[in-house]
A protein has these predicted regions:
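Glycine-rich anion-binding surface patch
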Residues: 1-125
Length: 125
C-alpha cells in the first residue's frame, strides 16, 4: 500500500487536488501508470479540473458555484483570491484559491471529504 500524507484541503493544489476531485467524481487516477483516467466522452486523458476548464467548468455548473473576488485584505495588500461556494453544498464548504477552478475544486473536496484528507505521498510536491 502506498504512503499517504495528511493535507489541509485549503492547501491542496496541482496533482493532489486533481486526484481528490477525481476520487469524488469516481475516477481512479492511481490505477493507470501515467495517472490518466477514463472520462466518458473523452477516453483516457489527464484529468486536471483545477487547471483545465474542459473538466473544471462542468463541475462549476454542476454545483452552481458562486464566486467572489477578494482584491485585498484589510491592510490593502493585494490577495488576488477567489472564494467559491456551491449552491448545493454546505455554507461552511466555501474555499479560496488563486483561480476560479482551484477555488471550486477545493470547495468540492472540502464539502465531500472534509477539512483535511489523506493524499498519496507521491502526489505532494
Amino acid at each position: 500500500m502506498s504512503e499517504t500524507v495528511e493535507v489541509k484541503t485549503c492547501d491542496l493544489e496541482g496533482a493532489a487536488l486533481d486526484w481528490a476531485v477525481a476520487v469524488i467524481e469516481g475516477y481512479d487516477l492511481m490505477k493507470h501508470p501515467f495517472r490518466r483516467a477514463f472520462i466518458p466522452n473523452f477516453g483516457y486523458c489527464d484529468y486536471s479540473p483545477s487547471t483545465n476548464w474542459t473538466f473544471g467548468g462542468p463541475l462549476i455548473e454542476k454545483h452552481r458555484f458562486e464566486f467572489e473576488w477578494i482584491g485585498s485584505d484589510w491592510h490593502g495588500e493585494p490577495l488576488r483570491l477567489f472564494t467559491a461556494c456551491g449552491c448545493d453544498m454546505p455554507a461552511d464548504a466555501t474555499s479560496a484559491g488563486p483561480t476560479h477552478l482551484i477555488a471550486a475544486c477545493r470547495a468540492i473536496v472540502r464539502a465531500k471529504l472534509g477539512e483535511t484528507i489523506n493524499v498519496p505521498a507521491e502526489l505532494i510536491k
